[in-house]
Every structure is written in structure tokens, then in C-alpha cells.
């Protein structure tokens, strides 16, 4: 019996930090949907806070990802991961500006579309990053 493992795309600390933007952008999307269904202004505040914290934690993740891209020889998955995360971070920044407006005008169609796009891209980035590790065991 032997096991082989291809090195993963992420360092364990990088993976832990990546989990925050994934959860927070998803939570912000859920808060936007709750706001649109209830018109309770606190949901818009929750979304703005989650987007802001996702950007704060996502900044170092993005820098680490760019350094990862520069150091990799096989850049295929790393390039796609960095592209998805970078676009998600920029859309999240635009979304933070959108959510900083008056609560009645912050979510609407534009806020919801930005939340959907940033959530989808950060989920795709997480999927790419966490599926890059391959472990194989062979029993003889």
C-alpha cells in the first residue's frame, strides 16, 4: 500500500483565511434577500458589515494568492483561482460602496446583482482552491 499526494494549491493558513470571504459574501447575499423580503433595514446593515469584513480579510488572501501565482510553475488552476477571487473582491468593493448608501436604496437590483456575482465568484474560487489537492491511495 502506498499513498501519493500532489501538493495542494493553498497553504493551510491561506485556506482558513479564504473561508471567511466565502462565508461572509454568502451571508451578505442571504441578508440582501432577507432585506428584499422584509424591508427591515437592519438586514441591509448586516450585509454591509459582512461585505466590509469579507474585504478586510480578503485583501491579505488576494495578496497571498498573487504571490502564489508568481511562485507556481503549473499556473493553470492558480491563475483561474486568482482571477475569480480578484474579480469577486473588486465586485465586493463596488458592492460595499453600493451598500453604504441609504438603506432604502442600497440593496435593490444593483446590490443584489453585485452580491450574487461576488458570492458566485468567491464560491468558484474556493471550489478551485480546495479541489486542487489530489490524494490517491493504492492497495496491493
Functional labels for PLM-detected ranges:
Residues 10-18, 35-57, 77-81:
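Transmembrane alpha-helix entry/boundary detector in multi-pass membrane proteins
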Amino acid at each position: 500500500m502506498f499513498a501519493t499526494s500532489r501538493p495542494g494549491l493553498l497553504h493551510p493558513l491561506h485556506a482558513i483565511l479564504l473561508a471567511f470571504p466565502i462565508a461572509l459574501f454568502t451571508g451578505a447575499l442571504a441578508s440582501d434577500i432577507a432585506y428584499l423580503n422584509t424591508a427591515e433595514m437592519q438586514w441591509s446593515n448586516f450585509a454591509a458589515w459582512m461585505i466590509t469584513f469579507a474585504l478586510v480579510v480578503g485583501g491579505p488572501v488576494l495578496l497571498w494568492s498573487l504571490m502564489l501565482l508568481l511562485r507556481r510553475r503549473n499556473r493553470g488552476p492558480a491563475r483561474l483561482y486568482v482571477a475569480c477571487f480578484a474579480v469577486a473582491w473588486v465586485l465586493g468593493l463596488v458592492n460595499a460602496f453600493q451598500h453604504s448608501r441609504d438603506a432604502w436604496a442600497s440593496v435593490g437590483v444593483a446590490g443584489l446583482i453585485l452580491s450574487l456575482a461576488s458570492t458566485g465568484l468567491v464560491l468558484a474560487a474556493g471550489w478551485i482552491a480546495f479541489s486542487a489537492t489530489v490524494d490517491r491511495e493504492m492497495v496491493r
